[in-house]
């Protein structure tokens, strides 16, 4: 690596200093420095050492409370709790989604989403197991207890929490 001595372009600097500015320079204000407002961490209050005149320039006050408006948008991940899936196996190969839905509905009163039957990608044939999504893990445990001992076409239904 080569080290080159720095020589400023003094001639160019002097030439630029001689340029006369256009417009009324008296109306231009130059702010030397500004300081950002300080916030206390983990609170919603502005720092104690902030002066009263600085508080008026604070763009917003951080808030940890929920919005006061009841129709405020809440993302779906925050709105509903973590869902849980149950794997239903040992199902007959001629099973349909509607039939499985009616069988589960007849044995439990827990709300569940429509069952997803797992199909073979190449042939499109049912593979013998399905997944049911529920609102919580407690509902999943209740569904497993309710479906214990259920037989479909002389096949014992097996239910377990999906991994």
From Swiss-Prot:
InterPro entries reported for this sequence:
Nucleotide-bd_a/b_plait_sf, RBD_domain_sf, RRM_dom
Q: Name one Pfam family in it.
A: RRM_1
User: PROSITE patterns annotated for this entry?
Assistant: RRM (PS50102)
SMART domains for the chain:
RRM (SM00360)
RRM domain residues: 84-163
Disulfide bridge map: none
Entry's Gene Ontology molecular function annotations: RNA binding
State the protein's name.
Answer: RRM-domain-containing protein ECU01_0840
State the organism of origin: Encephalitozoon cuniculi (strain GB-M1)
């Amino acid at each position: 690596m080569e080290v080159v001595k720095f020589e400023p372009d003094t001639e160019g600097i002097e030439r630029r200093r001689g340029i006369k500015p256009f417009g009324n320079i008296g109306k231009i204000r130059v702010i030397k420095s500004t300081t950002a407002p300080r916030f206390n961490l983990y609170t919603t209050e502005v720092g104690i050492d902030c002066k009263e005149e600085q508080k008026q320039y604070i763009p917003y006050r951080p808030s940890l409370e929920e919005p006061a408006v009841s129709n405020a948008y809440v993302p779906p991940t925050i709105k509903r709790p973590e869902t849980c899936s149950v794997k239903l196996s040992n199902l007959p190969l001629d099973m349909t989604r509607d039939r499985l839905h009616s069988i589960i509905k007849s044995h439990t009163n827990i709300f569940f989403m429509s069952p997803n039957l797992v199909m073979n990608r190449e042939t499109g044939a049912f593979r013998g197991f399905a997944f049911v999504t529920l609102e919580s893990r407690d509902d999943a445990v209740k569904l497993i207890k309710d479906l214990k001992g259920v037989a479909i076409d002389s096949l014992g239904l097996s239910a377990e929490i999906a991994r």
